[in-house]
Amino acid sequence: MIIKVCGMRDADNIRAVSALGVDMIGLIFWPQSPRYVRMINSRSGIIPDKAGEGVVDDGLARPKLVGVFVDEMPQNIVTRVYNYTLDYVQLHGHESPTMIDNLRRTLDPDIRPGIKIIKAVSVGCADDVERCRDYEGCV
């Protein structure tokens, strides 16, 4: 069984959940979410809000970090993967197989070797399940 806790933002919460031995922690990078992990402005541009940096660096096995994105521009995904050292990218929008394939080629091996990509697909009928076949080989 794999346990993923999603929507984490607070450093103390991340520490506590990590101590429980969860496998993955999800960081929401969708601005419309109340659990959105924001980037903060600096004079040199946009940098990640690293207030919680190192919160899971206590000698224990670190949970894998999953970045959750909805219809985000690929360059913003690449920036977040790099800045947050994400292990997984989870896509919840209308991302095409071509976009996902291009994203993977950009990230692996140069920026984040071995990164995993998850594509969430809403299923309401049998045709939606068939649509999943379009993503074979790119996720």
Give a label for each model feature.
Residues 1-139:
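Conserved N-terminal beta1-alpha1 strand-loop-helix module at the mouth
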